[in-house]
Each structure stands twice: as C-alpha cells, then as structure tokens.
UniProtKB/Swiss-Prot annotation:
Residues 348-376, 480-501 are annotated as: Disordered. It comes from Homo sapiens (Human). A lipid is attached at S529 (GPI-anchor amidated serine). The lineage of its organism: Eukaryota, Metazoa, Chordata, Craniata, Vertebrata. GO terms for molecular function: coreceptor activity. Cell surface proteoglycan that bears heparan sulfate. Putative cell surface coreceptor for growth factors, extracellular matrix proteins, proteases and anti-proteases. Enhances migration and invasion of cancer cells through WNT5A signaling. This is Glypican-6. It is found in: Cell membrane. Keywords: Cell membrane, Dwarfism, Glycoprotein, GPI-anchor, Heparan sulfate, Lipoprotein, Membrane, Proteoglycan, Secreted, Signal.
Length: 555
C-alpha cells in the first residue's frame, strides 16, 4: 500500500474512533422538535438548531439531544399539567352525572313538597273554610318539619307525625264538642288517647309507615348523590408525586429530546406509568363500587314501595279521610274521652249554641295512583330514577379504569395496533416489561414509576371513609331505617324510624348493625332507650336462670 494512502486513512480512523458510540458523524437537525415545541407555546430561544451532547439531562437518556436543561424543566411541568387535565377530562362523565342528577333530584323533591302543601291548603280552604284557616298552623308545621328533615334537620319522623295527629285530635275534639270548654290540661289528656282510641282510623299508622320510609329513602339518596359528587370532584384533582412527574416527562416528552416529536408512547408503557401514578385512585374502586351498588338498591326502593311521589301526591286526600273517620266516630270518641279524662265544663252560651260543623260531611274524589304528574324539574320520579340507574351503572369501576381510558386516547399513545413504532422510554421500539396489576401494593415492582407502597395517600383514604359511611346509611335506608333515629318500639311497623312493610312481604334485608342514637322529641329532650334495652336484657337473663334452676329441680 502506498505510503500516502496510509497517511490519509490512519488519521480518519482515529477521528472516527474518537466520536461517541452511536453518534452520527453529523449532528441531526432539531427542526421538527423546534416546530413541535413552539406549537406548545414555548419560546424557540430555548431550543438549539442541532443536537447537542446530553450529559446535562436529568430525566431523558443522556445521548445527543435537542433538549437543554431549561427545556427539560419546562416539559416536565407541561407533562404534569397535561396529566392533571387528562384525569379531569377522563372523569368528567362521572362528575357531571352526580352534579346534574343531584340538582334534578333535589329540585324534584323540594317542588314535590311545595306542591303537596299547596294542594292540601287549597283543598282544605275550599272544604273547611275558616275552620281550616283558624287551625292551618297544624298542617303548616307538618310540612315545615318534613322539609326540615329532607334538608338534613334533626327531626325524628315518627315522633313528629305522632305529634301532628295528637295536635289534630285536640283541634278536632274541640270542633266536634263546641258546647264544652277544654283547658290545656284536658286537651293534653285527650291527646294521650290517640293511639288507644284510633279516632282517625288506620290512616295515621299507614301514613307513618309510608312517609317515614319514603322520606328516609329520598333524603338518603340525595345525600348519596352529594357524597358521590364531592368524592368525584376531589379525586379527579390529582397531585402527582415527583416520581410520577419524572415518569410522565420520560413518557410524553423525552421523544422530543431524542428528535422524535411525532412518536407516541407504546400503549403498555403508558399503562404502567398511569397505574403507578394513579395507584391510590385505583384503591378507591372497591368502596366506590359498593357505594354504587347501595345507591342502585335505594333507587329501586324509590321506584317501588318507598316512592315519595306516590306518598305525597295524595297526602291531602289521606288526611281528609282521617278527618272523616274522626267525624263519623265522634260520639264514641267523645264518650271514651269523657270517661277517661272526666266531664268537661260547659262552654259559654254563645259558643255552645254552635253545632258540629256540617263541612266535615264533604267527600273528596278518590286518588288515582296512575296519575303521576310531572313537576317543573321536568319529569316524574319514575323517569328520574330510571335515568340515574343507567348512569350509576356506567360509573362502576371508573377509578381503576382511568389508566385504560387515558391510554386508549389516540392523542396520548400509539395505540395497541402499533407496538413496534412507538416510544418505549428509551427508543422507538416495542415495550417489553409486563403490565402491572391495579392498586398501590401491586406497584412494588413497577418499572416506570417509583411508588412507595408503604404510604397510602391520606386524602384518598379520607374519600374511602366518606364512601363507607354513606354506603352504611344507604343500606339502612334500603331497609327503611334512619341510621340517626332508631328506637326500640314494638309497633307492628318494626324497629327503627320508617321500617316495616305493612301487609307486603319484605324483601331480603341487609344484615347491618348501626349505632343507635337517642331519639329526640319535639321539645328536643332525649329519650333514653338504653335503659329499656338494659331492662329487657336483665329480664331475659333472669328468666333464663329460673328455667335452668327448674330443670335442675326436675332431674
């Protein structure tokens, strides 16, 4: 070989060997990256025209790159913002479902109460005239307390309804006996005979069962919509950890630094990143699904035996029927009251000249349960419940499905059909690691996100607890019990405010134990039911001991 050839080739070989491994002889242009970077709204002054050495990079591969330190920082922040927006957009359906349906149900129930009160007032003004108007506060107080209960007030429905019928009996008793004067003490004695005499027939018992369980179901269902709305709103606002932000940057924008701005992440790569970043949200799913199941069960009650619309629409007719019963049995009722409370004093001559009002003989049209009027809320309860049930079913498993929903978005990943020409975190090639399972504990070996599985997110745990408490309330409402007002009464309607199925066969109930709160009477005095419970327990224990002793004596 001529000496001049060696003199040329050897220096060239030395130059080639001195280049970094894998580098091009000529640095590639960053034109595509500049265009994509500028489209994001960033200044082009940050970005070089050609690739530069990448030793300064902290997240992306330290090879020849189009990213400066400033670019990597800005793109890290951009990836965080985009992730937060993705989660919020993906959970948009469940959030709007609870927001819009809560508004519709709340409007419906409030207007239903307003319409029922107006209907009763109009009917009773036409029928009883001044007699009703002089005693209208009894009925106004009834609706005031029903509204207060619905909006979360500390109202014991059973005691409130008992008080209503007792007050109505006092007023009615005076009207059917105008020839007598009744003192406050005498009227108090009269009210004590309400249960014994049953002056209003069976209407109070049936109405108590219907009203209590319908209102318990309605109030609890709306509370459930409120809790679902609040949990969905809170959980959709994520705060990614530093480890998550690094993984997001590497997945979304390290392709920019490698000069591959149009190459999207591999689908499985995206899933592992999202499962790591949303590990705590996935743990919400179990309690969320139980909450949705309980909401669906109460929704079925609202369609059937606990339908508040079918209770409130004819309430004026039912109360009127009770008044008719009282009027028809007035002589027997008066005689028994006089026997128990004593003979009242005669009234002054002017008042005793009045006779029992003829108005009570008026009859009202029978209520047709097929008449289901709509309200200004736009629909009847049946249609509202059917709609919400469909939406609730679609919201199950929403939190564990977030990674799949996000990674299915064509604007985020290359899709499942393009597994070779996608970004795998290092280069444009197939992503090989296996996909992690859902939840925090399953991220211990996540190859993309550094997750501390020993420190569950406190905020998410608070939402889990809120759902658990609400689910328990819904289970009680399903069984006709108000979790805040359960008593130990032995009425045929069963224990607990609003329980009982009348002549129906009760469906299978949840087995659930609640913490019993003391009932509260209209004067806000606590009624200690624990003493009665202790008495029953002591009696049972004593009887058991006696039986055992007798058995021994007989041996």
């Amino acid at each position: 070989m001529p000496s001049w050839i060696g003199a040329v080739i050897l220096p060239l070989l030395g130059l080639l060997l001195s280049l970094p491994a894998g580098a091009d002889v000529k640095a590639r242009s960053c034109g595509e990256v500049r265009q994509a970077y500028g489209a994001k709204g960033f200044s082009l002054a940050d970005i070089p025209y050609q690739e530069i050495a990448g030793e300064h990079l902290r997240i992306c591969p330290q090879e020849y790159t189009c990213c400066t330190t400033e670019m990597e920082d800005k793109l890290s922040q951009q990836s965080k913002l985009e992730f937060e927006n993705l989660v919020e957009e993906t959970s948009h359906f469940v959030r709007t479902t609870f927001v819009s349906r809560h508004k519709k149900f709340d409007e419906f129930f409030r207007e239903l109460l307003e319409n029922a009160e107006k209907s009763l007032n109009d009917m009773f003004v036409r029928t009883y005239g001044m007699l009703y108007m002089q005693n209208s506060e009894v009925f106004q107080d009834l609706f005031t307390e029903l509204k207060r209960y619905y909006t979360g007030g500390n109202v014991n429905l059973e005691e409130m309804l008992n008080d209503f019928w007792a007050r109505l009996l006092e007023r009615m008793f005076q009207l059917i006996n105008p020839q007598y004067h009744f003192s406050e003490d005498y009227l108090e004695c009269v009210s004590k005979y309400t249960d014994q005499l049953k002056p209003f027939g069976d209407v109070p018992r049936k109405l108590k069962i219907q009203v209590t369980r319908a209102f318990i179901a309605a109030r609890t269902f709306v509370q459930g919509l409120t809790v679902g709305r609040e949990v969905a709103n809170r959980v959709s606002k994520v705060s990614p950890t530093p480890g998550c932000i690094r993984a997001l940057m590497k997945m979304l924008y390290c392709p920019y630094c490698r000069g591959l701005p149009t190459v999207r992440p591999c689908n499985n790569y995206c899933l592992n990143v999202m499962k790591g970043c949303l590990a705590n949200q996935a743990d919400l799913d179990t309690e969320w699904n139980l909450f949705i199941d309980a909401m669906l069960l109460v929704a079925e009650r609202l369609e059937g035996p606990f339908n508040i619309e079918s209770v409130m629409d004819p309430i004026d007719v039912k109360i009127s029927e009770a008044i008719m019963n009282m009027q028809e049995n007035s002589m027997q009722v008066s005689a028994k009251v006089f026997q128990g409370c004593g003979q009242p004093k005669p009234a002054p001559a002017l008042r005793s000249a009045r006779s029992a009002p003829e108005n009570f003989n008026t009859r009202f049209r029978p209520y047709n349960p097929e008449e289901r009027p709509t309200t200004a809320a736009g629909t009847s309860l049946d249609r509202l419940v059917t709609d919400i049930k469909e939406k609730l079913k679609l919201s199950k498993k929403v939190w564990s499905a977030l990674p799949y929903t996000i990674c299915k978005d064509e604007s985020v990943t290359a899709g499942t059909s393009n597994e070779e020409e996608c970004w795998n975190g290092h280069s444009k090639a197939r992503y090989l690691p296996e996909i992690m399972n859902d939840g925090l504990t399953n991220q211990i070996n996540n190859p993309e996100v550094d997750v501390d599985i020993t420190r569950p997110d406190t905020f998410i745990r608070q939402q889990i607890m809120a759902l658990r408490v609400m689910t328990n309330k819904l289970k009680n409402a399903y069984n006709g019990n108000d979790v805040n007002f359960q008593d130990t009464s032995d009425e045929s309607s069963g224990s607990g405010s609003g329980s009982g199925c009348m002549d129906d066969v009760c469906p299978t109930e949840f087995e659930f134990v609640t913490t019993e709160a003391p009932a509260v009477d209209p004067d806000r005095r606590e009624v200690d039911s624990s003493a009665a419970q202790r008495g029953h327990s002591l009696l049972s224990w004593s009887l058991t001991c006696i039986v055992l002793a007798l058995q021994r004596l007989c041996r």
